[in-house]
Amino acid sequence: GLYQMKPETPFITGMEAAGTVETVGPGVSQFKPGDRVVAMVDHGAYAEKVSAPATRVFALPDTMPFDDACALMCAWGTAHHALRQRARLQSGETLLVLGGAGSTGLAAISIGKAIGARVIAVASSDTKRAACLESGADVALPYEDLRDALKRETGGRGVDVAFDPVGGAAFEVAARAMARTGRLLVVGFASGEIPKLAANLVLLKESSVVGVFWGNFVNTEPELYAENNRELFDWHTRSVIRTRIDESRP
């Protein structure tokens, strides 16, 4: 595939694990057996037991279910880092979310609203657009005639931030829809197509194209990563955000 992390096969999949601590390693004082925690690992979470570095383990609020905790890790962590650190999204700005009904897209919609942005989501079907609206999007658009629709929805001004986990043809539409000094976030390539960018669009709009590699952020800025998680947990506890879980299995 095109994803940048490629562990050697065979390997156990899964990045998020939540449960109670069984044992702690030497020098670990912030956790003890019985604590409710969630952990992030590079892979191997789909197992009965998981070992994780203490810097990747986080204490859970008593009211947070384990499945919600897992949901908040990768997809929500990616969207939060993208909008908080990479885009520096501000209240009152307009946020465009491509792939709005995907896991990171739905997270970006909710986080954008929590920050105070106006959110325009894009998704490929009526059902998916309904999911975007349920997650808080102010507007949900199809990909067809997207360029004209964005002009209409922004009064010709464009969007301040575009969140793109899809790539492909929609990337250029987003690049053309940027407001002056807008920030176009390169989050992923779910379409399977890594797009090319006409650099003159960046020049003319004085916009920025900003990469988002959450896995690298987690490894290089663990203290800020922990701070991000605290904000997500606080929002969840206060019902500012709500995860969307399709199905849970024992």
Locations of regions flagged by a protein language model:
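Short glycine-centered segments of the SAM/dcSAM-binding site in methyltransferase folds
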Residues: R36, T94, R118, G182-R183, ...
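Adenosine-nucleotide cofactor-binding segment
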Residues: V97, K113-V173, E221-E227
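A glycine-rich, Thr/Ser-enriched phosphate-binding loop motif common to dinucleotide/cofactor-binding enzymes
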Residues: T63-Q85, G99-A101
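A structural motif shared across PLP-dependent enzymes of the aminotransferase-like
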Residues: V41-A54
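Glycine-rich phosphate-binding loop and adjacent beta-alpha segment
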Residues: A123, A169-I241
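Glycine-rich NAD(P) Rossmann-fold beta1-alpha1 loop
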Residues: W76-G77, G99-L106, D164-G168
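Short helix-loop-beta connector
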Residues: K32, D62-D67, R88-T94, G156-R157
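Glycine-rich beta-strand-centered segment in the early N-terminal region that forms part
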Residues: L2-G44
